[in-house]
Amino acid sequence: MLRVALAKGRLLKSFIEYLQQVNQIDIATVLLNRQRQLLLTVDNIEMILVKGSDVPTYVEQGIADVGIVGSDILNGQKYNINKLLDLPFGKCHFALAAKPETSRYKKVATSYVHTATQFFNKEGMDVEVIHLNGSVELSCVVDMVDAIVDIVQTGSTLTANGLVEKKHISEINAKLITNKESYFKQSSEIERLIKQLGVSINYA
C-alpha cells in the first residue's frame, strides 16, 4: 500500500480536475466524495489530506511515501526528501499587487515572508514586510500597507478588491515528492502512480 499526502484546498481541487482529465476517475471520485474524511483508500493507494505546508514534513518523517505539494511550500524551507517531478497542474504565480495608483512600496503584507523578502532583496528595495495569515488583500484595501505579495491564479480576487498586479514574481506548480527510503523500497508502487498521472521523471 502506497501512502500519499495531498495538500488540501486550492491544489487538491486542481489535482481532482487533472485526475479527471487523465481518466483516473476512481481516484477522483473518492476525493470528490470525501466529505470530512482525511484518510481515504482506493486502488491500493492510501491518501491522507493535510495542510499544504505540512505535506513535506509527513513525507520527510516517513508517514507518507509520496506527497503532492505546491512548489511555493518547498521554496521556503529545506527538507530531506526527493523532489522528483514537476506536475502539470496547480499552476499559478507569486505577484506584487497594489492599488492602481500606487507606485512606491514601503510597507507590504504577505503570508509568504520568505518569498517576499527574497524578492525585495533581489530588487534592492528597502521594504518592511508584515506577516499576515490570511485575507492579505484587506490590508491593502484599508491602507495598512502599500502593497501585498500573494499567490495569483486568475486575478479575480485582486480585481474584486480594486487591486492590480504590479509585478510577476515567480511561477508556482505542483510537485511530486518522495520519502528517500520509500523511493527505493516502494519504487514499483511509485512508478505505477507516476504512470497513472501520465507524467515522466525529470528529477526536478
Swiss-Prot record:
Transmembrane segments: none
Iron-sulfur keyword on record: no
Superkingdom, taxonomy of origin: Bacteria
Enzyme category, top tier: transferase
Pfam families recorded: HisG
Annotated source species: Staphylococcus epidermidis (strain ATCC 35984 / DSM 28319 / BCRC 17069 / CCUG 31568 / BM 3577 / RP62A)
Major place of residence: cytoplasm
A Gene Ontology biological process term: L-histidine biosynthetic process
Protein name per Swiss-Prot or TrEMBL: ATP phosphoribosyltransferase
PANTHER family: ATP PHOSPHORIBOSYLTRANSFERASE, ATP PHOSPHORIBOSYLTRANSFERASE ATP-PRTASE
Subcellular location: Cytoplasm
UniProt lineage: Bacteria, Bacillati, Bacillota, Bacilli, Bacillales
Pathway named in the protein's UniProt entry: Amino-acid biosynthesis; L-histidine biosynthesis; L-histidine from 5-phospho-alpha-D-ribose 1-diphosphate: step 1/9
InterPro entries assigned: ATP_PRibTrfase_cat, ATP_PRibTrfase_HisG, ATP_PRibTrfase_HisG_short
Keywords noted in UniProt: Amino-acid biosynthesis, ATP-binding, Cytoplasm, Glycosyltransferase, Histidine biosynthesis, Nucleotide-binding, Transferase
Molecular function terms, GO-annotated: ATP binding; ATP phosphoribosyltransferase activity
Quaternary structure, from the entry: Heteromultimer composed of HisG and HisZ subunits.
Family named by the database record: Belongs to the ATP phosphoribosyltransferase family. Short subfamily.
EC number(s) from the headed UniProt entry: 2.4.2.17
HAMAP family on file: HisG_Short
Reaction(s) catalysed by this chain's protein: 1-(5-phospho-beta-D-ribosyl)-ATP + diphosphate = 5-phospho-alpha-D-ribose 1-diphosphate + ATP
Gene Ontology CC annotation, any one: cytoplasm
UniProt key word Nucleotide-binding: yes
This protein's domain notes: Lacks the C-terminal regulatory region which is replaced by HisZ.
Biological role stated in the UniProt entry: Catalyzes the condensation of ATP and 5-phosphoribose 1-diphosphate to form N'-(5'-phosphoribosyl)-ATP (PR-ATP). Has a crucial role in the pathway because the rate of histidine biosynthesis seems to be controlled primarily by regulation of HisG enzymatic activity.
